Amino acid sequence: MAYRFIKWFEELSKNDVPLVGGKGANLGEMTNAGIPVPPGFCVTAEAYKYFVENVKVSKEDVKRILGEKVNKGTISEVLAQAPDEPRPLQDWIMDIISKTDVDDSKMLQENTEAIRTLIKSLDMPSEIAEEIKQAYKELSQRFGQEEVYVAVRSSATAEDLPEASFAGQQETYLDVLGADDVIDKVKRCWASLWTARATFYRAKQGFDHSKVYLSAVVQKMVNSEKSGVMFTANPVTNNRNEIMINASWGLGEAVVSGAVTPDEYIVEKGTWKIKEKVIAKKEVMVIRNPETGRGTVMVKVAEYLGPEWVEKQVLTDEQIIEVAKMGQKIEDHYGWPQDIEWAYDKDDGKLYIVQSRPITTLKEEATAEEAEEVEEAEVILKGLGASPGIGAGRVVVIFDASEIDKVKEGDILVTTMTNPDMVPAMKRAAAIVTDEGGRTSHAAIVSRELGIPCVVGTKEATKKLKTGMYVTVDGTRGLVYKGIVKSLVKKKEEAKAEGGQVVVAGAPLVTGTMVKVNVSMPEVAERAAATGADGVGLLRAEHMILSIGQHPIKFIKEGKEEELVEKLAEGIEKVAAAFYPRPVWYRTLDAPTNEFREMPGGEDEPEERNPMLGWRGIRRGLDQPELLRAEFKAIKKVVEKGYNNIGVMLPLVSHPEQIREAKRIAREVGLEPHKDVAWGVMIEVPAAAIIIEDLIKEGIDFVSFGTNDLTQYTLAIDRDNERVAKLYDETHPAVLKLIKHVIKVCKRYGVETSICGQAGSDPKMARILVRLGIDSISANPDAVQLIRQVVAQEERKLMLEAARKQLFEEEEEEELF
């Protein structure tokens, strides 16, 4: 075949993704649309393919390049089995990958590093090198220079592999100077196709490693005086009539990576009125390395530009409007709102567009008629939006679980507050509305997991709404409309036809901090697993046990223990199988007495003034060991089927003796802690946080913060009482100090730390937890992707801050709290 190694932007369009990847194709498309894109060319995917298929590598080459690495592990095995004659680099790569267990992180790191080293160390074929040199020479001549500064970026090309899957995985090199340096950076881009996390992702998604290629974009470097990103639809409010611009000093990497908090400007389309300006404190900026003339460094704004520049508005009002209008032009070309990277070049003062991609998080825009209908619809009730989405139908008001049969498929369930006994009715409902509760209440948690719209804390739903009425529930905004609002229902149906509220992870980022998911019911295991979560940080026992329709102790006393064990085992296995080999942490029963009392056979349950502080969790489990024993028997059944990914998590622990006694009961039924299952505890009681070292010495593998309880116990706030809900704050300094202390001690002893409370689904809390060094965060199914993005961003910030600290030799930073 005739290979095409180089393609100029002018020769490309959006249809050339297979040849130059999404990034390269997009730059070509914009160039030909008259957008001011810095000129450049792409080293095509065919060049990479030619490189790996035509560069012959001998055993001696491998030994010379990899040195001591060839004497151990996979590389040694591959060498021993390889033929003596030189063979294509691709054969070596595929042999190494075929023998790599991607779940063995040490092996994965070592083997992918070996592949990258081979790619970077081998000479570029002369036929490719000469074309790159000639193209670079032509690019330099366009600017009347012998050598021009360029940026070299990777661009993924597999048509069935979204480029988003490579986000943060392949390399970008800025301020590259000279043809030889360009060739080196192209090879480094190619090598980044084989990072551990990119390889892991492809393996887990079932992609064929041999059919994934990489193009490298070589583009004239904008020597940015000011730069940033813009969204041609407001990503916060979903308002398509607004453009949001973020701006900071220097090169755009500081903004894109999250290393700096940029200025934020909101511009109204059409009128070009600047509606809002938030001037940030911009501490750092990225510039061309002044010492080497190559690459970039991060410097302090106060030292490089002057103290007054830290809080100075980056863009003039005229520039804000110029950037906004350019964004509108790009959106008009593509016909969809765009996420755009822009920069002002300090050499010529002109605005340039570096990259543009569609915003994928927007919902379809309502028509003017639909918007008017929503505006005119009568809001009859307001509360807290607890689970997003739209639900419309006939109201059914119930007050206890004995009435759940009244709720039919598609009804709107209205009640004071839901409980586990109502779950069968909740599954049938089109939406749920409650008088009481907050975003951490039972109704909120279960609705989010089921994907059912829910509004909580309305105070008067059961009074204002009558059985037989028709209403439309907006679980996103916390509103209940009178009657059926057709435009909202239409949007819901369109979303459903397109797959509904998508939680499936098309291309999850790989983060150092694991992002897990909370699961209440085995029925949603597949949906939860599809989020791409790294495991289950909380599998609740309550719904499985209470769904038997009878008080579990009465069930056991009637000689039905084996039936209970089977039902539990069936549910646990369903989740363990959906996530295997990812870990699944099962929390033993933690239902308060009021939930037991409402069940058939629960008439002997004690009346407690505050059940949340009463007979529940492990304290009840040890008082009624027959129930805990049944749970352990169920887990043993699942383990015996080969599921070695289960952990046991004890709730409401406050003393080491509770751990010791629970282990004794587990061993009685043949379940061996630390061997058959991982063993851990919930940190929900301040006492557990304070004596964490004693709990660790009793023998635990992991802990998980139950912040819903930890917060209410620390602050003396009933989380389901809407009168004090405004005081409920998981980020209260006292709560955070307890969490920080536990993480610090657990790190010292090698005990894994996680969180499974509602706070794990809060981006603000996730950022704090990453900085505190937590090992994993377990979120609700609908929040997994958001939390993973937040975690990835915060981890990048930490790495950049560490680099800056080393660069500036700063004093040790203040503690977060």
From Swiss-Prot:
Mg(2+) binds at residues 684, 709. One of its GO terms (molecular function) is pyruvate, water dikinase activity. It catalyses: pyruvate + ATP + H2O = phosphoenolpyruvate + AMP + phosphate + 2 H(+). GO terms for biological process: gluconeogenesis. The active site is at 442 (tele-phosphohistidine intermediate), 756 (proton donor). Catalyzes the phosphorylation of pyruvate to phosphoenolpyruvate. This is Phosphoenolpyruvate synthase.
